[in-house]
Amino acid sequence: VDTLTAPRPANGADRRRWWARPQRWAMALALATGALHGPNAHAGSQKEEALADSVRLALSNAILDARPPKPTFRNPADQQRYQVWLAQMSARLQRRLPDQQVRTEFLETAWYEAHRAGLDPGLVLGLIQVESAYRKYAVSMVGARGYMQVMPFWTNVIGDRNRSALFNMQTNLRYGCAILRMYLDMEAGNLYLALGRYNGSRGRPEYPNAVLSAWQNWKFKSPL
């Protein structure tokens, strides 16, 4: 398959603080677990992996920063593009999330958490489409929860052990984006493999292809 490379987090104090030197701690994770190169798991059956202390700390810092999703912009043009993005995505999402207030809050949070982790917001929206069909309280057969179908064990590994918080919009999106960013760094930017790892089906085409296809529904067409 072709190698798909996702963007790195942009420069800025906020991103430097919680995601410092991702390649270094991603390598530490690869060395810390023997499961990385083992047999492919079935979809939805991903296993908890041992994390190096540096990886655990980086992810914990990413999750526990409780500031609200209030974006800042370099200039008025960037802010205008953001507003256009919100309008476009809101129109596309209306059928799935008919309540305007809920839809706006969801999109603002998804945009913020995606950018915070250096991800394309459209990719995150496509992943959510595949994972939960935008159902806040979705629970999979293996117990994954919420919009981004986060496995509860992550709350023990990098959170505060509050599994019910995975049904909180911002908490769920923050976990999901941080975990996907970690997998991207583990896979040296290979989005295809990172998506497979997110789903517990690394190396199998069904899930990555589904997300990449859904991503097309959320591509931003900037008029600026």
PLM ranges: what are they?
Residues 1-90, 96-97, 220-224:
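N-terminal secretory targeting signals
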Residues 67-224:
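Catalytic glycan-binding domains that act on GlcNAc-containing polysaccharides
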